[in-house]
């Protein structure tokens, strides 16, 4: 009789623990970084970096602007769906998150944020330290709703999706003279960025995170804004901006291969998420993927004061952010890379 009770308790315990893994792998998605992932945290900040105004959100449910920088869902939402977790990743700073929201993951990212300490302060958005502090607050809430043991299991098995560097290179390095004043060449600056990114993930690791999906930056030289200001008469991609982006990505890629072997990251897994080449493939072969415009944004530009009628035909929705369809297109490969690298 005792052995039967033990068996039942073991099976029940196994079942309870397994509920922390969706499809046998990941119980939650926790997103950090910039506007590629931000699902509405900036709504509650005193900053001009806002995505909760028209024409953002026009493809979202009920055609409402939620704080996402795009026409609909952003990359963090789509990754959450691709991992089998949920279709919408809520912002941590929204007024209310249910226990279910907390157990399956939230977003800490902030549009305009960067890993360079200068970047977030320039735009008055959440700094890396702010996001880490929010993560600590999230863990306290998760422990209160799920219990300490289950909360620890959720955090250690969650995918930690990190997007940092786009604003640092695009704004702090190319858009302002701050990097030049600090005497930083592209090589030195991208080395510092990669180091700051590693330090940020170590702070998340120290709170229990173990599975990191580290996103490279997108082709910054091919953004509609870059093409207009630096692309010349034919508004081509800017080679130098792309070269710096690739330089940074190369250092991130190398880091994801070595950090997991360091004593300070014992038990952690890292996978590099190649945003640059997957999006560049869509830009170069846009017609093959069902787009009709790869150079201009659908809205919010000098060339598109009135929003286009169909954002699904545009690779970019505004002057820097991909459209939801572009995110869905590149996610097919990238989500599989995350699954393979962190399973």
From Swiss-Prot:
Required for the formation of pollen coats and male fertility. Its EC number is 3.1.1.-. The active site is at residues 35, 318, 321. The gene is EXL4. This is GDSL esterase/lipase EXL4. It holds the Pfam family Lipase_GDSL. It comes from Arabidopsis thaliana. Flower buds and pollen. Glycans are attached at residue 23. Disruption phenotype: Reduced pollen fertility. Pollen grain exhibit a partial formation of coat and impaired water absorption and germination capacities. Belongs to the 'GDSL' lipolytic enzyme family. SUPFAM superfamilies: SGNH hydrolase (SSF52266). PROSITE patterns: LIPASE_GDSL_SER.
């Amino acid at each position: 009789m005792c052995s039967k009770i033990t068996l039942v308790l073991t099976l029940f315990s196994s079942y309870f623990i397994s509920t922390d893994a969706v499809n046998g792998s990941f119980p939650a998605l926790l997103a950090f970084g910039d506007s590629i992932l931000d699902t509405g945290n900036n709504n509650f900040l005193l900053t001009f970096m806002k995505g909760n105004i028209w024409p953002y959100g026009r493809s979202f449910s009920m055609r409402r602007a939620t704080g996402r920088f795009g026409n609909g869902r952003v990359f963090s939402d789509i990754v959450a769906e691709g991992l089998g977790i949920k279709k919408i990743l809520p912002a941590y700073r929204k007024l209310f998150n249910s226990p279910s929201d907390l157990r399956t993951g939230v977003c800490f990212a902030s549009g305009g944020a960067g890993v360079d300490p200068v970047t977030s302060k320039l735009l008055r958005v959440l700094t890396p330290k702010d996001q880490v502090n929010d993560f600590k607050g999230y863990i306290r809430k998760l422990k209160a709703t799920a219990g300490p043991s289950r909360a620890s299991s959720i955090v250690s098995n969650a995918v930690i999706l990190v997007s940092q560097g786009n604003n640092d290179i695009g704004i702090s390095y190319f858009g302002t003279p701050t990097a030049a004043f600090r005497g930083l060449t592209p090589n030195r600056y991208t080395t510092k960025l990669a180091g700051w990114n590693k330090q940020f993930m170590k702070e998340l690791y120290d709170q229990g995170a173990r599975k990191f999906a580290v996103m490279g930056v997108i082709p910054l030289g091919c953004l509609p804004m870059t093409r207009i200001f630096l692309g010349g008469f034919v508004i081509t991609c800017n080679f130098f901006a792309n070269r710096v982006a690739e330089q940074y990505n190369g250092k991130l890629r190398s880091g994801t291969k070595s950090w997991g072997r360091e004593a300070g990251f014992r038990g952690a897994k890292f996978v590099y998420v190649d945003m640059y080449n997957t999006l560049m493939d869509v830009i170069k072969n846009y017609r093959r993927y069902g787009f009709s415009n790869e150079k201009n944004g659908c809205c919010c530009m000098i060339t598109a004061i009135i929003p286009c009628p169909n954002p699904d035909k545009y690779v970019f929705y505004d002057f820097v952010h991909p459209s939801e369809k572009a995110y869905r297109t590149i996610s097919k490969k990238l989500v599989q890379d995350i699954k393979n690298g962190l399973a």
